[in-house]
């Protein structure tokens, strides 16, 4: 199946602690159906001191399931479903079903 959400896409969180917030996809993990989104699903990690790193509590992004994400419409920034269509020149592109705008290329 083709990827509806890709690295670099602007997405909106549909469910969970960060519902309604948006961010940029940093990484997609297709085998796990999860994605890493900048500024979303922040967790605190307690780091023990090592020779290379100081001890402390660090905040970082955790992965979020793809079913809890929707692509942001390029026109208005709201959540939209994604469709695929083939253009006249033969390229297969993603488009926002809400507005009909082409997302890539």
UniProtKB/Swiss-Prot annotation:
The keyword Nucleus is assigned to this record: no
Role summary: One of two assembly initiator proteins, it binds directly to the 5'-end of the 23S rRNA, where it nucleates assembly of the 50S subunit.
Pfam families in the record: KOW, ribosomal_L24
TM spans (from-to): none
Subunit organization: Part of the 50S ribosomal subunit.
Keyword field: Ribonucleoprotein, Ribosomal protein, RNA-binding, rRNA-binding
Cystine pairings recorded for this chain: none
HAMAP family on file: Ribosomal_uL24_B
GO MF terms, alphabetically ordered: rRNA binding; structural constituent of ribosome
Protein name as catalogued: Large ribosomal subunit protein uL24
GO cellular component: ribonucleoprotein complex; ribosome
Organism domain of life: Bacteria
Claim: RNA-binding is one of the keywords in the record: yes
Taxonomic lineage: Bacteria, Pseudomonadati, Pseudomonadota, Alphaproteobacteria, Hyphomicrobiales
Family statement: Belongs to the universal ribosomal protein uL24 family.
GO biological process, any: translation
Gene3D superfamilies named in the record: 2.30.30.30
């Amino acid at each position: 199946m083709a990827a509806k959400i890709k690295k670099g896409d602007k997405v909106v969180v549909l469910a969970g602690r960060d519902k309604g917030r948006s961010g940029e996809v940093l990484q997609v993990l297709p085998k796990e159906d999860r994605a890493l989104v900048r500024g979303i699903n922040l967790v605190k990690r307690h780091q023990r001191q090592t020779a290379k790193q100081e001890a402390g509590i660090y905040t970082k992004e955790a992965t979020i399931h793809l079913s809890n994400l929707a692509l942001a419409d390029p026109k208005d920034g709201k959540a939209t479903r994604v469709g695929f269509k083939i253009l006249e020149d033969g390229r297969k592109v993603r488009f926002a079903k809400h507005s009909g705008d082409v997302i890539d290329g």
